[in-house]
């Protein structure tokens, strides 16, 4: 009744070209706690990377085509940095998502606040789940991320330490990345 429709898909469906992001005005990439995980004490190749190279390419193409992207996840920066062996993932973060990693394990209290920025509609104080419960995943180790391009600004900070929790960019496309 609000006039908006929603389509949900897996990142694999984007990677396998089953879903064309260009068909959508906005994309909300919810990563949650997804990050590269070493399996069987390293006997098996790592899995569950938040931004596999094929997804990076699809998101870059979408953004460069004028798409609007919202990304959230506890390891949104640290997974790109820690799984990067060639520098390509860091370039993707800086050139497409317009952020750089400051640190992992950035906060423990679960509160962010908006800060002065060109984005006047992003305002208020917010809490995210930081305690174990049976209803929702817990953000145990959020990332602090900082702007990495002209036109990118910190829009949220962790209330307990003032580290940057969210970065927004508006240029040829719009992207907002949240480290929680």
Feature names for model-found ranges:
Residues 1-6, 60, 65, 93-95, ...:
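Carbohydrate-binding surfaces of carbohydrate-active enzymes
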Residues 1-34, 171-173:
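Aromatic-Pro/Gly-enriched surface loop or interdomain linker
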Residues 6-8, 25-31, 63, 68-73, ...:
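Structural recognition of the beta-strand scaffold that forms the well-ordered cores
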Residues 11-18, 53-58, 160-164:
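Alpha-helical scaffolding within the catalytic cores
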Residues 19-23, 62-65, 147-149, 169-171:
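Extracellular/periplasmic catalytic domains that process cell-envelope and extracellular macromolecules
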Residues 35-141, 150-152, 159-160:
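A glycine-rich, often tryptophan-bearing local segment used as a flexible ligand/cofactor-contacting loop or short
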Residues 80, 179-180:
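Segments surrounding the PLD/"HKD" phosphodiesterase catalytic module and close analogs
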Residues 142-144, 153-174:
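Short, surface-exposed beta-strand/loop micro-motifs that present aromatic residues
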